[in-house]
Amino acid sequence: MWNEFKKFAFKGNVVDLAVGVVIGAAFGKIVSSLVKDIITPLLGMVLGGVDFTSLHFGYGKSAVMYGNFIQTIFDFLIIAASIFMFVKVFNKLTSKKEEEKEEEIPEPTKEEVLLSEIRDLLKQQNSSKDRA
């Protein structure tokens, strides 16, 4: 049972997925900070001091903080656009590497060369028998 767990836990895909989740969480924090600390204040200056997070409505002590919701949507859109651009660049780089691999014709192995020579000799023998 322990060996099965080790095979599962240390498979390349599982480890890659775990690394992706950790990096994704850190990337999300970076983009959230970018939106909260840089983009939203700049947008506020352009639009005359608009701060989404303070927007709310309510009655008495109850309040619906729809500004936080708008801010979260804004964060999501920026994160989604950033990930889209990252994946697009990554796919472009990956496809170039695959094209380079396809262009390279591998050298035939010794066995392939030997088999080709044997095939050619057999063809010569068969063609000389047909002529005789």
Swiss-Prot record:
Gene3D superfamilies: Large-conductance mechanosensitive channel, MscL, domain 1. It is found in: Cell membrane. The chain crosses the membrane at residues 14-34, 38-58, 67-87. GO terms for cellular component: plasma membrane. InterPro entries: Mechanosensitive_channel_CS, MS_channel, MSC/AndL, MscL_channel. It comes from the Bacteria. Pfam families: MscL. Keywords: Cell membrane, Ion channel, Ion transport, Membrane, Transmembrane, Transmembrane helix, Transport. It is a multi-pass membrane protein. GO terms for molecular function: mechanosensitive monoatomic ion channel activity. HAMAP family: MscL. Homopentamer. Channel that opens in response to stretch forces in the membrane lipid bilayer. May participate in the regulation of osmotic pressure changes within the cell. This is Large-conductance mechanosensitive channel. It comes from Bacillus cereus (strain ATCC 10987 / NRS 248). The lineage of its organism: Bacteria, Bacillati, Bacillota, Bacilli, Bacillales.
